[in-house]
């Protein structure tokens, strides 16, 4: 089944690892919907109705309204239990509300319905990597980026690179990240992970240069600040190290990276 453009756009937004986080679910009642989101049309055939609710659920997901996203996607799945995208995207939402067994079930069902779907393979690979099953995830990213109908293979290469890093496969990570950058030049997420490759190889000057270039274009999160702090420490730049430590403390006091700093666990 050829993936539609809207699903490719959703995957482009939400599936890049370790860098961009979704807004937490809103606490408002489920009927409190943004005024600018249209009410889905109600055509007669189930597939069109399921697609409309899936698209709407994906929009709420992008907006961080996970409660309403789940409602729309569950409705889509009930209307057409054979519409794979509804289950694939619902799996992502279920991951973000920490319903991991239910997310796994949805991804498996989506793959049973359409095992070649590049979006579902990429989504499931991402889920596996995020739940400490990175070694299993690589094959699903490969199924995604090798599929000629996939509109955003750069995302699957990026995710594969990040997951190779998680399991210490540095050469494979670099290869995947460079392939992602060839398709999506100057992508900050790919550049961040490539800086991590440089760091792990001991190329601290290259890592520092790349990180500073990325920070000049995007607002850094705790992961990037932490990697740059460790790089400056390796280079003996104590003033820059202390400045970055202050930024972590002020901006991200609850982050895992700041907790590592407090424990002086630099590696």
What are these regions (language model features)?
Residues 28-46, 218-267:
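Terminal, low-structured helical/coil segments at or just beyond the last alpha-helical repeat
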Residues 50, 84-85, 118-119, 152-154, ...:
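Helix-start (N-cap) detector for alpha-helical repeat units in TPR-like alpha-solenoids
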Residues 62, 96-97, 130-131, 166, ...:
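Register position in tetratricopeptide repeats
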Residues 45-79, 96:
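Alpha-helical segment of the N-proximal tetratricopeptide repeat
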Residues 45, 79, 113-114, 147-149, ...:
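Structural marker of alpha-solenoid helical repeat scaffolds
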